[in-house]
């Protein structure tokens, strides 16, 4: 009887874990829209733009007795397919490349974290945003698409959540 109770408890916990991972509180790994900041040290203006990144829940496990066995590799939500987009930073001095490239997620999957290409979490040396300055360095996105031949007209506000058209050629 005790073995049957243990088996029943194990089944309930297993099924409950699956239900919890598929619920609305934990969306699965998928491309989502995110607003990022682009800046270069020599260029005076930082701009925000919207692109797609990989984000969401990946099933993982933690050992009950971590000291007895080596850690289990934890999957992360990462790119399956991607392309690169680019934007032109306005106001860069001559001799400084004003183009900034960034990945655009086409599809995502749960897989190992590759430190060369992926932010695997943990502490950061700097925030992923425009550096605070005495003057306003972050600008609203321009009204026209950014390509290698167009330059945005700086806006007046500090931040924007409006999408910035990007060149993804």
From Swiss-Prot:
Transmembrane segments: none annotated. It is found in: Secreted. Promotes spermatogenesis and ovulation by stimulating the testes and ovaries to synthesize steroids. Its main location: secreted. Disulfide bonds join 29-77, 43-92, 46-130, 54-108, 58-110, 113-120. GO terms for cellular component: cytoplasm; extracellular space. This is Lutropin/choriogonadotropin subunit beta. Pfam families: Cys_knot. InterPro entries: Cystine-knot_cytokine, Glyco_hormone_CN, Gonadotropin_bsu, Gonadotropin_bsu_CS. The keyword Disulfide bond applies. GO terms for molecular function: hormone activity. Residues 1-20 form the signal peptide. Keywords: Disulfide bond, Glycoprotein, Hormone, Secreted, Signal. Residues 145-158 have a biased composition (Low complexity). Heterodimer of a common alpha chain and a unique beta chain which confers biological specificity to thyrotropin, lutropin, follitropin and gonadotropin. It comes from Equus asinus (Donkey).
């Amino acid at each position: 009887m005790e073995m049957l109770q243990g088996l029943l408890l194990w089944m309930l916990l297993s099924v409950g874990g699956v239900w919890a991972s598929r619920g609305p509180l934990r969306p699965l790994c998928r491309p989502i829209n995110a607003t990022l900041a682009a800046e270069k040290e020599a260029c005076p203006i930082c701009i925000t733009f919207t692109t797609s990144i990989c984000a969401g829940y990946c099933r993982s496990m933690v050992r009950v007795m971590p000291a007895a066995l080596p850690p289990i590799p934890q999957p992360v939500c990462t790119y399956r397919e991607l392309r690169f987009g680019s934007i032109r930073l306005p106001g860069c001095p001559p001799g400084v490349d004003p183009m900034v490239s960034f990945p655009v997620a086409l599809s995502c999957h749960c897989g190992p974290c590759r430190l060369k290409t992926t932010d695997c979490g943990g502490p950061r040396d700097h925030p992923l945003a425009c550096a605070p300055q005495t003057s306003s360095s972050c600008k609203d996105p321009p009204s026209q698409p950014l390509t290698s031949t167009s330059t945005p007209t700086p806006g007046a506000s500090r931040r924007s959540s409006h999408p910035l058209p990007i060149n993804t050629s």
